[in-house]
């Protein structure tokens, strides 16, 4: 199942779809609900894929000109040296300009090709994350609590100041 999970709140693709279905508290694969594409392919590559949706750790571009993954047109395949793809996982899919485009969290910084990716590229990000054992960056809970306390204190302090209507309207 190559379906992507879109966030119901904003429609962005953020998580890897494990596929399957949950029966009696366990995720199982059935003919109606097979394993997700990333989980299936990662298993073939010898990695253990998660059984729950996990955030995608988007792979960075090597530079401004190149994509995170090498891409080749099918018309040039016959001219490529076999060593280029030998022993590698190769995904074959369409990279069309209008169809099969999915908004990702990267659309915040680039609303073009990086932010609206073809499905095959989203799957490639998920597969390499599992095979490389990468996790998405997270903020430690202590930082979250500290920032929350700081801004709550700052907001409370500002609200206690009585500097007239100009100050209150300006904030």
Task: Walk through the language-model features, giving the residues of each.
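Juxtamembrane interface at the cytosolic side of transmembrane helices
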Residues: 155-171
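Flexible inter-domain connectors and hinge/loop segments
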Residues: 1-153
